[in-house]
Amino acid sequence: MTDTLMTPPATPTAEPRTPILALDDVTKAYGTHVALSHMTLSVYAGEVTCVLGDNGAGKSTLIKTLSGLHKPTEGRVLIDGETVALKSPKDAIARGISTVFQDLAVVPDMPVWRNFYLGHEVVRGPNWLGMVAPLDAEHMKRTTDSALKSMGIDLPDVTVPISTLSGGQRQVVAIARAVHFGARAIILDEPTAALGVKQSGMVLRFVQQAKERGLGVILITHNPHHAYLVGDHFVLLGHGRMQLDAGRQDITFEQLTAQMA
């Protein structure tokens, strides 16, 4: 009897993932000043991509390009693998890309529920003869309260002015608003800037929760400690150029800190 050599079965290869949001060799120039040079970046569902850098590194230009505020001078923006020409932040939001800027786009004297529904107001009944229908305040209050609670944010009262909340609470409300209204990827502009340890921890826990919900998160920060607490992927910008592109498994906190020195 002749032994037959058996070829082991091939190990199935994982299909390549498609990023929710990506930049392909993007350059952004303002006249002769190149603010962002040949930037390539991929943001995947269920991952936190941290973009670090000092002032003037190009972080603000990156945010404006990803959010649809500015068009790239060269290169491509892709959503779900398809090249898109984002015309505005509203266009980006319609495609599931939402940005929470440092100013949070909140109206301080308005209650929490009004800020939660800002731009998404629910009215009672149809709009007859050009007349503005009244807001369905009770529906929006109930939904705001239940939506925040479902995301682990338990505010005693959503009818108080949002200015009465702590900085960390305002941040998580702004992030929760983006999640509730359909964001698949969220861009967070220095969400822990000027916050204390406790408030920063609140925001970072919510970033982790957004990741666990399957969102792609871009965390813009100058704080490597905060980045390493939640990050899966780290990008370091300097003078508009990518100086580091590393996965969490490829870099230690000490190495990340040293790169920023």
Task: Cite the ranges covered by each PLM segment.
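Intrinsically disordered, low-complexity terminal tails and inter-domain linkers enriched
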Residues: 9-13
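Glycine-rich phosphate-binding loops of nucleotide-dependent enzymes
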Residues: 3-5, 15-261
